[in-house]
Structure formats: structure tokens, C-alpha cells
Amino acid sequence: MTTTTIEAPAIAGFHLSPEKVLGQVEPYSPGATDAASTLLQQNHEKWHMYFRDVAGHNHIPHAILTALPPMEAPTVGKMRDPAVFRQHMQRLDQYSNFLAFFEQELEQPGSSKEAVVSRYCFSRTPLADFMLAQLFEGLYHPIIHLGFGIEFHLPGLVAEGLAQAASHDPMKIDVFFQAAEALAGTGSLASKPLVELYRQVRASDTLRTAARLSDGPWKVRDGVLGRAFDEIVNVAAQFQVSSNEHDVQRATVEMMSCAAWACGGPHRPGKERKIDFFLMHCVTSSIFFTVLGRATWISIADKARLVEWKARLDLVWYAACAAPELRDENFLNYEPTLSRGMDWRQLYHALNRYHDDGHVAKFVRALKNAEEVALPFEQEHADILPVKGDAWFRIAQICYDSTASHTEAQKKWVWGVGFAPMWDLVPDFVTSS
């Protein structure tokens, strides 16, 4: 069918109000009607009424208006009760209810995103401690989402991040956090540099082999925490951060450096360079510990706790990837390919010109931030910072060079860097003639 396309003017004729309509059983959620209004307007502006000659009718508005979800007011209204809140946590199907709840919390008179995050993550109540642990679930995605909301001052993203944390299915990391914190609190273990703890994980047959490929997506829950819980708790509890500004900043840099080390250090000789998809998130999420570390409304004790928990979970993820050998020369001696001759500015521009679902750009930005915040500590603490100086950019180049030629996520990364069979899926390295 040949048509002449004329851009339709935007008209304000698609605002729904949550009024009773024919055949309605329950009231509609205001959030649902707002979302439907937006979708109807987008359909009006972008999509034709006919998408093929025969029976090609646009049914999008019909579907939107017929399938409006009902308001779950009884659930949302009761969530201020910690027992009710906790009852609905860790259930993916409760995300919408938690989102509506946190939106309401943020819209309360005199409320703010800082006050809501403080109440539900940093008030040291049993519920807040559980919510704080949930921020680290799902390969750090809730804290990444929340971090963006705080960094860019977007309450809507804060609500989404909190709702994601509350509803995310569990890997049981809350039990791990509490056990490691309790053991560290006994004073029976001396504090050690994080780089030494990575080496402890690598040296432990129990930890290195706890996760199995057959665990699928549950290598943390069923592998490391399921088969080597006491061992990983004993190692992780040795990373301890004092509640003073200097130690929190130093420990944050230490965490960033070791996370980057776990990404740039592993390599299988004879294979193309690849960064591990899972360990990459340890770096990507690290930037938000700068964001949270600079938040004046978070106490220094809570900032220390945040960094402790992040570094301890990074150790778990390192073990979940079979604790690969980390060799400094794999990034210090790296010869760039596509990024040869680039600086940070040129690399940023290059990132905007190729196919990326956001993972590479977030990883590179986190490395740039780490380079900046690490600089004041690199001379005094060089021995505990495996990545420093030019190495931050080298690892960013590895990431860009190894992903830019691929559009499929499966080909951009190695999916379990310490497991030999996963390297079988990576092409052999071919020397250019």
C-alpha cells in the first residue's frame, strides 16, 4: 500500500482520567491511566491507522484502553506497615505495587528522595537492612538504577530503583552480608587489603570450584553461597572500613581498582580479548559509590558499610566466575587495535558511534571516574591498587576494542571468564598480516 505520510500534529486529546467505564470491575490505577495517556499520544503521532492493505488495522488504542490494570490500593496502602512491606518483597510481580508505593512516598508533603532513601535503606531497622542488601541483588542493577536517579536528581528513577530492589528475586546475599558483618565485628579477623583477598579466593580450591556451569544463572546462590558459604564469609569479613572520611575514600578506590583488575587481568592465550560480562558490572556499579560517598545526607558509618558490602560482594562474584588468574601484564602490555591513538575524549565520541546497549559506555565512564578519584591515593597506596595510572584507560580500550565489532551481546563478552568451556565460544586470536 502506497501512502503519502504527513506528520500528524500533536493534540492534547489523549489524557485519561480514572473514571468508571463500561464493564469495569475495579478502579483503575492513576499510574496506569497516565501511562496509557502517554502511549495513546505516541500511537497518534507515530503510527498509521493501516499497516497493511488487508485487515491491517491499528488495534493499539483498543488494547491499551481495554487492558488497563486495576488499582491495587489495598496492597499499596498497607505497605507503610513494615510487616506488609516485607511480605511482598522479593516478588517480581510486586514491582508495580512497590513503584506506586515509592511514588506516593516521594510525593508526600515535605518529602524528598533523600529522606525516602534514608528511611528505607539507611535507618538501620531490620527492614532497611534488608532493603539495603536488596540494592545489591540482580548483579547490582537496583543500586545502579538508584544511583542514576540520585546522580541526575531524578525522583522517578529513585522510585524505580527502590521498587526494583524491593521486588527483586533473591540470591540470599542478605544472609551473606549479615554473616560477614557479624564476623568482622567480633574483632577476630585482622583487616587486609582487598587485593590480598582476591588472591585468597583464587588460592582456595573450595572457593574457586564452588560455582559450576550447571548452576546456570544461580552461580552465586547455589554455587559460592550454597557450597562455600563459610569460606567466602571468612575471606570477605577481612575487608573492613573505618568510619572516617579518608578511609572510606581510600577503600572506595581500592574496591574500584580491584574490580577493574578482575576485568582486565584474566585472559586465555590464543583467544581474542574479552571482558567478563558479570565482572564488568562490578566496575559499572562502582561509580555510584562515588555518588553515594559524596551524599551529605548519608552518615559516614553508612558510607563505610556500603563500601564494605560492595567489595565483599565483588569477591563473591569473582568466585562465581571461577576465580580466574589475574595477570597485570594482560592490561599493562595490551596493544590497542580500534582504539589505537585515542584519548578519553576520542573514546567517548567513538562509543556514541557504534552499536552498544549501554554496557560498554557505562563501564568506560566508571573507569574514567575511578581514574579521577584514585589519583590522590595512587602514590601512597600503590601496593594495594593493582589498577592505577594509565591502566584505567588501557582497560577501557580493551573493552571498546573487544566489543565494537559485534552487535550480539553473546559475542561482546565472555560469560564466565574462569570456566574453560566458555572460552571455547570465543574466536581464536588471529595476528593481522
UniProtKB/Swiss-Prot annotation:
Q: What happens when the gene is disrupted?
A: Does not completely abolish the neosartorin synthesis, but accumulates chrysophanol.
Q: Which Pfam families match?
A: Questin_oxidase (PF14027)
Query: Which GO terms of the molecular function aspect are on file?
Result: oxidoreductase activity
Entry's transmembrane regions = none
- Give the first-level EC class, as a single word: oxidoreductase
Q: Which family is it part of?
A: Belongs to the AflY oxidoreductase family.
The molecule here is called Baeyer-Villiger monooxygenase nsrF
Q: Which gene is transcribed and translated to give this protein? A: nsrF
